[in-house]
């Protein structure tokens, strides 16, 4: 009887251990399926972005662009108009306020120059060149949405009286070089976005319904993604000694 009891006890332990291992395996499989599903969902949304959110984005002839997604236009007066490029505008979407720099302020390339706000969120943009702020676009202070209507003309944010124009222009991109750089930035954003979790139900509905992502992707994502975007795309370190 003792031998039978021992055998039954061993069998019971084996069965119990098998059940535990099976349960753990199923749990790991469900977790893996969830993670894989999220990655697929993120990738599926990301695949839409270059085709839709960045559709029609280009850099006009004669416009210089900087790594921090600002643009520079040379004026006949010798001053430069500076603004926020169309890539950044399309990613950020709605703009509730434009923080204009102070006239007379001297800035160096890479220092904060202006900012835009969306609700409680803020995105700082750095100066693409050295100079003194000679004027600002007061219209954007009253109507910030106007910045999106004509980004490279009426959407200028401030004018600088440049101090190291020849040197700074060598650090910017123009024409084919600017277009090639912009293509790389679109690809980089796709990779960046693919790693972000979908937090917004609204974005999920857009995806499920086969909707077109026409811009303003950050409006539908969390604050962490906003801060990561501004850090990785707008606050990139720029060379100052080329």
Go through each PLM region and give its residues.
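Contiguous, well-folded functional domains in the mature portion of proteins
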Residues: 1-242
């Amino acid at each position: 009887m003792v031998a039978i009891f021992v055998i039954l006890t061993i069998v019971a332990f084996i069965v119990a251990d098998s059940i535990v291992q099976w349960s753990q395996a199923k749990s790991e499989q469900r977790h893996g399926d969830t993670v894989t599903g999220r990655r697929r969902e993120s990738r599926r949304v990301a695949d839409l972005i270059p085709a839709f959110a960045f559709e029609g984005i280009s850099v006009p002839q004669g416009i210089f662009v900087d790594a921090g997604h600002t643009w520079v236009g040379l004026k006949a007066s010798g001053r430069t108009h500076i603004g926020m490029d169309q890539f950044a505008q399309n990613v950020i979407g709605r703009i509730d306020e434009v923080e204009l720099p102070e006239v007379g302020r001297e800035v160096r390339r890479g220092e904060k120059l202006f900012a835009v706000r969306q609700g409680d969120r803020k995105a700082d943009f750095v100066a693409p060149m050295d100079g003194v702020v000679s004027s600002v676009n007061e219209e954007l202070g009253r109507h910030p949405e106007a910045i999106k209507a004509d980004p490279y003309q009426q959407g200028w944010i401030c004018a600088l009286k440049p101090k190291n124009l020849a040197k700074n222009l060598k650090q910017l991109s123009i024409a084919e070089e600017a277009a090639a750089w912009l293509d790389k930035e679109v690809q980089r954003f796709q990779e960046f976005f693919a790693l972000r979790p979908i937090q917004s139900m609204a974005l999920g509905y857009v995806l499920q319904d086969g909707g077109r992502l026409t811009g303003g992707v950050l409006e539908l994502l969390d604050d962490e993604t906003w801060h990561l975007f501004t850090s990785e795309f707008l606050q990139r370190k720029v060379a100052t000694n080329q």
